[in-house]
Amino acid sequence: MDRFIRMLEDRVMPVAGKIAEQRHLQAIRDGIILSMPLLIIGSLFLIVGFLPIPGYNEWMAKWFGEHWLDKLLYPVGATFDIMALVVSFGVAYRLAEKYKVDALSAGAISLAAFLLATPYQVPFTPEGAKETIMVSGGIPVQWVGSKGLFVAMILAIVSTEIYRKIIQKNIVIKLPDGVPPAVARSFVALIPGAAVLVVVWVARLILEMTPFESFHNIVSVLLNKPLSVLGGSVFGAIVAVLLVQLLWSTGLHGAAIVGGVMGPIWLSLMDENRMVFQQNPNAELPNVITQQFFDLWIYIGGSGATLALALTMMFRARSRQLKSLGRLAIAPGIFNINEPITFGMPIVMNPLLIIPFILVPVVLVVVSYAAMATGLVAKPSGVAVPWTTPIVISGYLATGGKISGSILQIVNFFIAFAIYYPFFSIWDKQKAAEEQADPTISSGAGATHSL
C-alpha cells in the first residue's frame, strides 16, 4: 500500500495537477457552470408541469385551460434550449479572463462565431406530406441547445485564441486617450473579431461543399456520438469515478478535473432524457448515465459517498477525534459537501481509508446502473436537481416523481455503510489507542497515518 501511495504522489499527482491547471479545461468547466442556474430554473417548471398527483392534469386544465402545460413549459425552452449559446459566451469569457484580455468582447465574438457556424434551417413537414423539408430562416433549436454544446465549446476556444493572439501582437485600432474606455475596447475588438468571423465563414463555406455540410454535423460524427457512447456506458462511468476518487485521494479536486472533460457529455445526455420526458413523462428514457446519475445516486454525501461514514463516526466512534469530526461533518454531508471528512479524518493519502473511498463509488455505479437499466428504478428524467439537494428528496425529484429513485438512494447509503464500516472500525481503534496513550491529543481529527 505504501508503494501505491508513492506511485500516486510521484506519477498521478504531477499529471493531475497539470490537468487541473489547464486553462482551456477550466474555461469549459466554468462556462458550463454559467448555464446551471438557467437549467435549474427551467427544471422547476418541469417539476410543476409533471407532478405525479392523481387528477392533477384535469384540475390544472379546468383552472388554466386545455393548453396549460404548453404555456407552463415556455420557460423550459428559454433555459434548456439556449444552453449552447450560454456556454459559447461563458467559455470564451472565462478563457479571455485567464489571458487578461477583454472578456466581454471575447464572449460576444464567440457567440457570433457560433451563430455563423450554425445553419438557420429548421425541419418542417407540410400538412398531408410524408417527407420533411428544411425551411431557411428559422432558429435551429436543436443546435443552440444541448446538441450544439461541442461546437459551442470548440469555437469558443478557437475564437478566443485567435482574438487574444491578435490583441497580444497589438494588431488593433487605437483611439485617442480621451475616448471613453468602453468605446475604446469595442474598437480594439474590431480587427480580432473580423478575423475570427472570416475564418469561421470560410470554414463554413468549405464544409458546405462536403458531405458533412456544417460544423455541427462533422462534430457530431467525429466527437459527439463516440464520446456519448463512451460517456453513457457503464464502463465509461466506472472509469470516470475511478479517476475522480484517485484524484481526490491525492488531495486534488477529482470531480472538477474529470468533470471538465466529461461534464459536457453527461449534460448532453441529461438533456436528451429531458426532451423525451417533456414529451411523455411515461416514455422510456434513453440514458441511464447523466450528470444527475453521479451527483444524486453515486456521490451521496460527496465524492466517495461519505454520508454513511459521517453518521458512523457520529454514532459509533470510540475515538473523541472521530466522534467530534462526525458531528462537524454531518450537516455539510447532508448537502453532499464532504471536505471536512476528506481532509479532516483524513482520507487523503490515507492507505487504509483510500480503499473504501475508491471501492464504494464503483460498487454504487454498478448497482445503480443495473437497477435503472433493468427498469427496477426510474432513470433520471433530465430535471436539473441541484447536487446539494439531500437524498430521498433529490431522488424523487430527479426521476420525475418516482419513489424508486429515493429507494435506490437509501439502498446505496446502506451499501456504502457496509463497505466503509470495517475500515472505519480499524481506523477508530487506532485513533482511540493513540488518545489513550497520549491524553493531550486534541479533540480535532488527527492527521497521523498509523499504517
Curated annotation (Swiss-Prot):
Role this protein plays: The phosphoenolpyruvate-dependent sugar phosphotransferase system (sugar PTS), a major carbohydrate active transport system, catalyzes the phosphorylation of incoming sugar substrates concomitantly with their translocation across the cell membrane. The enzyme II CelABD PTS system is involved in cellobiose transport.
Q: Which residues form the PTS EIIC type-3 domain?
A: 8-423
- This protein's GO CC annotations: plasma membrane
- The record's gene field reads celB
Cell compartments where the protein resides: Cell membrane
**Cross-referenced InterPro entries, in alphabetical order?**
PTS_EIIC, PTS_EIIC_3, PTS_IIC_cello, PTS_Sugar-EIIC/EIIB
Q: What is this protein called?
A: PTS system cellobiose-specific EIIC component
Q: Which UniProt keywords apply?
A: Cell membrane, Membrane, Phosphotransferase system, Sugar transport, Transmembrane, Transmembrane helix, Transport
- PROSITE patterns referenced in this protein's UniProt entry, alphabetically: PTS_EIIC_TYPE_3 (PS51105)
- What topology does it adopt in the membrane? Multi-pass membrane protein
Give the GO molecular function terms: protein-N(PI)-phosphohistidine-sugar phosphotransferase activity
Domain of life, source organism: Bacteria
Q: What residues form the membrane-spanning segments?
A: 31-51, 72-92, 104-124, 138-158, 187-207, 227-247, 250-270, 293-313, 347-367, 407-427
Q: What is known of its domains?
A: The EIIC type-3 domain forms the PTS system translocation channel and contains the specific substrate-binding site.
Among the GO biological process terms of this entry, one is: carbohydrate derivative transport
